[in-house]
Structures are given as structure tokens and as C-alpha cells.
């Protein structure tokens, strides 16, 4: 039976560690985590094959499963898991409104909320400005000198939104990730409307 193990909340994870989506640190984390997922999923499939045997279509492989890893969009799951980023995608905005059958809700990036709280900037005025700027924090002057993480990264680099991130970085990370994935990868890119075709 094929499986599709993947990740949920990649951008949230990077932000919680103070790692910008762009750069060598994020690429290192991509390689480290996805290689570990590959190692552990193959180990588990071999262990299951020892207990339950290899299915006919896996005969001679030592595995219980034909496929183990895939990257899928996980928007619904990310909401259920506590408002974390979907799958491998960056956050589209650090604050946004969401409409559902139960009403309209304001969703905030919880990691950013903690950073703002730690710097005594978690105010309605700041969130209003972020919302007015389409979810971006780049125009919040109070954050100009705020650093975070082990490498003292500027907060404005860590909390860039999907459209603010160089899209080539998403492609680079997908290339790193693909060598550890044995199924397809769903990857979205965001280009400005004025970008040439």
C-alpha cells in the first residue's frame, strides 16, 4: 500500500526557529528534516515487512509499502492543527480574514504574535497596520531593529510573506526536497501580476 508522509507547517517551523525562508539555513533545515523523514519511513516500512511480509508488488524489496513520502497541500489540516502554515508553502499573510460557515475570523501568525508580545508591540494598532499592508510587516518601523533566533536574524526577514520571498528559493528548496520524496510534490509559486510570462 502506498503512503504519503509529508510535512505540515514548514514556514511556521522556520519562523519559530528564527530562520528566514530564503537562504542557506532554510536549505540546510530542508535537507536535514526531509532526509530524516526518508530514513525513518524506510526503516518503519522494513520493520513492517519483517512482521507482516512483503506484498506481492514489493517482493524482493524488503519494504511493506510501494511509496512512502509525498508533499501535499494541507490548508484544512493547518487550520485544525492550530493555525500553522500549510504544508511547505510560506504564509500568504501574517494576518488575514477568513470566512467560514461559522462567520468571519481574523487569523494571526502566532509566531509573529509571540515576537510582538516579547517586544511590547502586540497592539491593535500594529495588527491594523499589518492588515492594511496586506499582511506584510515590512512597513512597521518599530520592527526595524528587532532580531531573533540563534543567528540574530532581522524579524523582517523571518516574517516575509509568500509574495515577498524570492520564488526561486521555493524552487531551490523543492529541488533539495525532491531527492527524499518518492511521489509528487505540490508546489505553488506567487508572481506579481505585472511579471512577464
Question: What are the roles of these predicted feature ranges?
Answer:
Residues 69-197:
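Catalytic alpha/beta core of large soluble enzyme barrels
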Residues 1-2, 14-74, 127, 151-157, ...:
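Internal maturation/activation junctions in enzymes
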Residues 13-15, 85-86:
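Short connector loops/turns at beta-strand edges and beta->alpha or beta->beta junctions
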Amino acid at each position: 500500500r502506498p503512503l504519503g508522509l509529508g510535512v505540515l507547517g514548514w514556514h511556521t517551523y522556520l519562523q519559530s526557529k528564527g530562520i528566514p525562508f530564503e537562504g542557506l539555513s532554510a536549505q540546510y533545515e530542508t535537507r536535514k528534516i526531509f532526509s530524516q523523514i526518508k530514513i525513518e519511513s524506510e526503516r518503519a516500512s522494513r520493520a513492517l515487512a519483517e512482521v507482516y511480509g512483503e506484498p506481492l508488488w514489493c517482493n524482493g524489496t524488503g519494504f511493506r509499502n510501494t511509496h512512502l513520502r509525498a508533499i501535499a497541500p494541507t490548508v484544512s489540516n493547518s487550520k485544525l492543527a492550530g493555525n500553522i502554515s500549510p504544508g511547505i508553502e510560506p504564509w500568504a499573510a501574517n494576518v488575514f480574514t477568513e470566512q467560514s460557515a461559522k462567520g468571519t475570523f481574523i487569523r494571526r501568525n502566532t509566531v509573529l504574535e509571540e515576537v510582538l508580545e516579547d517586544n511590547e508591540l502586540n497592539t491593535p494598532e500594529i495588527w491594523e497596520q499589518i492588515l492594511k499592508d496586506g499582511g506584510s510587516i515590512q512597513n512597521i518601523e518599530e520592527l526595524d531593529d528587532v532580531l531573533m533566533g540563534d543567528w540574530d536574524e532581522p524579524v523582517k526577514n523571518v516574517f516575509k510573506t509568500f509574495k515577498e520571498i524570492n520564488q526561486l528559493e521555493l524552487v531551490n528548496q523543492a529541488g533539495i526536497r525532491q531527492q527524499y520524496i518518492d511521489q509528487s510534490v505540490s508546489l505553488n509559486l506567487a508572481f506579481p501580476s505585472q511579471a512577464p510570462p
